[in-house]
Curated annotation (Swiss-Prot):
UniProt subcellular location: Secreted
Entry keywords, A to Z: Amidation, Carbohydrate metabolism, Cleavage on pair of basic residues, D-amino acid, Disulfide bond, Glucose metabolism, Hormone, Neuropeptide, Pyrrolidone carboxylic acid, Secreted, Signal
Function summary: Hormone found in the sinus gland of isopods and decapods which controls the blood sugar level. Has a secretagogue action over the amylase released from the midgut gland. May act as a stress hormone and may be involved in the control of molting and reproduction.
Annotated SUPFAM superfamilies: Crustacean CHH/MIH/GIH neurohormone (SSF81778)
PANTHER family, per database record: ION TRANSPORT PEPTIDE, ISOFORM C (PTHR35981:SF2)
Pfam families named in the record: Crust_neurohorm
Valine amide: residues carrying this PTM: V132
Tissue expression from the record: Produced by the medulla terminalis X-organ in the eyestalks and transported to the sinus gland where they are stored and released. Present also in the ventral nervous system.
Protein family (similarity comment): Belongs to the arthropod CHH/MIH/GIH/VIH hormone family.
Name of the protein in its database record: Crustacean hyperglycemic hormones isoform B
Length: 134
């Protein structure tokens, strides 16, 4: 009796989560990100484009040396975290490199903010990008 009640409770909870809009990735989000990345002109928009660049991408490197703004390690970590979370959401390796391009001042970074449901703090991230940017 107790096992049946627990099973029924789990089924009801899963069903309610499925109908409430709470969930992981959406097909709409994936297609929107793929469309955004495919419209990019840069060579790193291809899945293996980051391998053809002249410099290697160091996983531990927190900041982009091309960014001429304020150097704040915590600020770079915060911006980089958005790109890493976006990669974890879509599992496409080129998202991380494309998201970091131009000192995070690009459409992919903005799309990642939207897809990670950070639109309520987007102004804070925009000002952070301007601080580290060129």
């Amino acid at each position: 009796m107790f096992a049946c009640r627990t099973l029924c409770l789990v089924v009801v909870m899963v069903a309610s989560l499925g109908t409430s809009g709470v969930g992981g990735r959406s097909v709409e989000g994936v297609s929107r990100m793929e469309k955004l990345l495919s419209s990019s002109i840069s060579p790193s928009s291809t899945p293996l484009g980051f391998l053809s660049q002249d410099h290697s991408v160091n996983k531990r490197q927190v900041f982009d040396q091309a960014c001429k703004g304020v150097y704040d390690r915590n600020l770079f970590k915060k911006l980089n975290r958005v790109c890493e979370d976006c990669y974890n959401l879509y599992r496409k390796p080129f998202i991380v490199t494309t998201c970091r391009e131009n000192c995070y001042s690009n459409r992919v970074f903005r799309q990642c903010l939207d897809d990670l449901l950070l639109s309520d703090v987007i102004d804070e991230y925009v000002s952070n990008v301007q601080m580290v940017g060129k």
